[in-house]
UniProtKB/Swiss-Prot annotation:
Ranges where the record places region Globular A domain: 4-94
Spans traversing the lipid bilayer: none
Free-text function comment from the UniProt entry: This protein is a component of ribonucleosomes.
InterPro entries: hnRNPA1_RRM1, Nucleotide-bd_a/b_plait_sf, RBD_domain_sf, RRM_dom
Domain RRM: start-end pairs: 14-97, 105-184
GO BP annotation list: mRNA splicing, via spliceosome
Coiled coil ranges: none
Identification of the protein by name: Heterogeneous nuclear ribonucleoproteins A1 homolog
Source species: Xenopus laevis
GO cellular component: catalytic step 2 spliceosome; cytoplasm
GO molecular function annotation: mRNA 3'-UTR binding
Biased composition annotated in UniProt, kind: Gly residues: 198-208, 330-365
Gene3D superfamilies: 3.30.70.330
Gene responsible for this protein: hnrnpa1
PROSITE patterns in UniProt: RRM
Length: 365
């Protein structure tokens, strides 16, 4: 690659995760396929460091984000006779957030002000793809905006493209954007984590903050809600709103209120709890692993050596296992596949156990 061709965009935005690879696929055959849509600066099939057997996934990095977009537009892709699943690669920082590796079509948008209307959201977000639905949440009683909205897209890639970009400005206001997860999706995450956590610890390295998620009950919801379960109510009590109803069992991390519930709780408010809050790392997007390529349990290939074992790409705990010497932060933060140059050091897996409240709730939105 000539100096004049040096990439001028962040590597993370130019990288694709390629899942579902045939075990016969090599770096060369993967490159041969994906270079049809642009110049590749890197291409690798991840392999077991001992057996050298393919793990069934890899990464390709393009020279520009336009080429990434072109490759995603060309879906579906078939490599060596097998349909594969390309997705925008998630950074280590982002992989620690709830649902980071889930395929969803809806985003949560925080920081919505009173002067922000549906047209403002549409004007900004339609650059990422076709929008199906925009919902600005309002108070049932007063009709005032509650500070957040949901945007649903036609294609999950629009969501992936949005969330890997850190900053968004809607109607001249800074907005926080995350994937919006349904009750079922959050429950599937919690269930797989509990199965791997042994005694209710959340993640591969230690417990969930100072206590298990939901106090000392061990499971989501802890002692509240009849011995566990995924929280007791939906987004802040009854549905999206509520009058101070407890969403999670109170803990040292300040998860006192639900999604936008009364008395200052919810997303980014109140004692550091909720969505992106401060405090001791609580809230959506805390410090550590929630799902996907992080946590204990079996490795990516599982004992059977199949991609995703029995649960496909979202079999949360099959992507990384430090105890199984998979592609977590091993030597120098690399994937453990023998690559020490570092292009994958900021990728999937690793970190401490998460302290995230997530969306949770008993009602689907």
């Amino acid at each position: 690659m000539h100096k004049s061709e040096a990439p001028n965009e962040p590597e993370q935005l130019r990288k694709l995760f390629i899942g579902g690879l045939s075990f016969e696929t090599t770096d060369e055959s993967l490159r041969e396929h994906f270079e049809q849509w642009g110049t590749l600066t890197d291409c690798v099939v991840m392999r077991d460091p001992n057996s050298k057997r393919s793990r069934g996934f890899g990464f390709v990095t393009y020279l520009s984000t336009d080429e990434v977009d072109a490759a995603m537009t060309a879906r579906p892709h078939k490599v060596d006779g097998r349909v594969v699943e390309p997705k925008r690669a998630v950074s280590r920082e982002d992989s620690s957030r709830p649902g980071a590796h889930l395929t969803v079509k809806k985003i949560f948008v925080g920081g919505i002000k009173e002067d922000t209307e549906e047209d403002h959201l549409r004007e900004y977000f339609e650059q990422y793809g076709k929008i199906e639905v925009i919902e600005i949440m309002t108070d049932r009683g007063s009709g005032k905006k509650r500070g957040f909205a949901f945007v649903t897209f036609e294609d999950h890639d629009s969501v992936d493209k949005i969330v890997i970009q850190k900053y968004h400005t809607v109607n001249n206001h800074n907005s926080q954007v995350r994937k919006a997860l349904s009750k079922q999706e959050m429950a599937s995450v919690s269930g797989s984590q509990r199965e791997r956590g042994g005694s209710g610890n959340y993640g591969s390295r230690g417990g969930f903050g100072n206590d298990n998620f939901g106090g000392r009950g061990g499971n989501f919801g802890g002692n509240r809600g009849g011995g566990g379960g995924f929280g007791n109510r939906g987004y802040g009590g009854d549905g999206y709103n509520g009058d101070g109803q407890l969403w999670w069992q109170p803990s040292l991390l300040g998860w006192n209120r639900g999604y936008g519930a009364g008395q200052g709780g919810g997303y980014g408010a109140g004692q550091g709890g909720g969505y992106g809050g401060g405090g001791q790392g609580g809230g959506y997007g805390g410090n550590g692993g929630y799902d996907g390529y992080n946590g204990g349990g079996s490795g990516f290939s599982g004992s059977g050596g199949n991609f995703g074992s029995s649960g496909g790409y979202n079999d949360f705990g099959n992507y990384n296992s430090q105890s199984s010497s998979n592609f977590g932060p091993m030597k120098g933060g690399n994937y453990g596949g023998g690559r020490n140059s570092g292009p994958y050091g900021g990728g999937y897996g690793g970190g401490s156990a998460s302290s995230s409240s997530g969306y949770g709730g008993g009602r689907r939105f």
